[in-house]
Amino acid sequence: MTEVRRRGRPGQAEPVAQKGAQALERGIAILQYLEKSGGSSSVSDISLNLDLPLSTTFRLLKVLQAADFVYQDSQLGWWHIGLGVFNVGAAYIHNRDVLSVAGPFMRRLMLLSGETVNVAIRNGNEAVLIGQLECKSMVRMCAPLGSRLPLHASGAGKALLYPLAEEELMSIILQTGLQQFTPTTLVDMPTLLKDLEQARELGYTVDKEEHVVGLNCIASAIYDDVGSVVAAISISGPSSRLTEDRFVSQGELVRDTARDISTALGLKAHL
């Protein structure tokens, strides 16, 4: 195991981390107070109500201002909730919109395929599971909501990759590398790129036990009203049931479901 050496005196790291956590908690408390105060307040009121020193309150507000989470009225000097908070909230609402629209289609897909249905989004260089509808089979393959999946080695991950422009795709792969999870994980660039090209042509991608041994997945990209990929929908099941002879029929079913969701989100033409 590689030893990580830190500069400074022994025992210094923990107090620094504690101070950082305390500053974060106080920053969140300020945002929550502004929200309860109708979106704005004076620095003195914030300081008084949160029992913080005035200098500390002002310093935290300046940090939040640098992140666009708050801004100061130049005339009155009051502090207001900024655009950064709106952007964070908008991302949450957008994801919830995808799920609320996808819900009926997920149920239909689950009933037609007989497999568990998942919805995932891309978060940086990972896919994150945000929605799931378990199948009714006694044997089913499920992962907890919030699970993180490798982009190159999961059905949902590859569905989030194949619509991307080659430059962005290569950038992601170079950053993440091609870690091997199972004997069938695609760990060389030419093979992965060929797999993604085929997925682009078919409108769906297949994960043949590439992330978990015994688990197969079929996934397709979901697009918003401007044609940007916003999520992926997949079915997952044991490889003994979701067998290779079902890949085409189930792949077309997943692809058509993704297209229906994309249309419901406002996409005018199929990509």
Curated annotation (Swiss-Prot):
Gene Ontology molecular function: DNA binding; DNA-binding transcription factor activity
UniProt cross-references to Pfam families, sorted A to Z: HTH_IclR, IclR_C
GO terms of biological process kind: negative regulation of DNA-templated transcription
Residues binding glyoxylate: S154, G155, A156, D207, C217, S234, I235, S236
Coiled coil: none
DNA-binding region in chain numbering: 43-62
HTH iclR-type domain mapped to chain residues: 21-83
Alphabetic keyword roster: DNA-binding, Repressor, Transcription, Transcription regulation
PROSITE patterns per the UniProt record, alphabetical: HTH_ICLR (PS51077), ICLR_ED (PS51078)
Domain IclR-ED span(s) in chain numbering: 98-267
Protein task: Negative regulator of allantoin and glyoxylate utilization operons. Binds to the gcl promoter and to the allS-allA intergenic region.
Alphabetical list of NCBIfam families matching this protein: PRK10163.1 (NF007548)
Name of the protein in its database record: HTH-type transcriptional repressor AllR
Phylogenetic lineage: Bacteria, Pseudomonadati, Pseudomonadota, Gammaproteobacteria, Enterobacterales
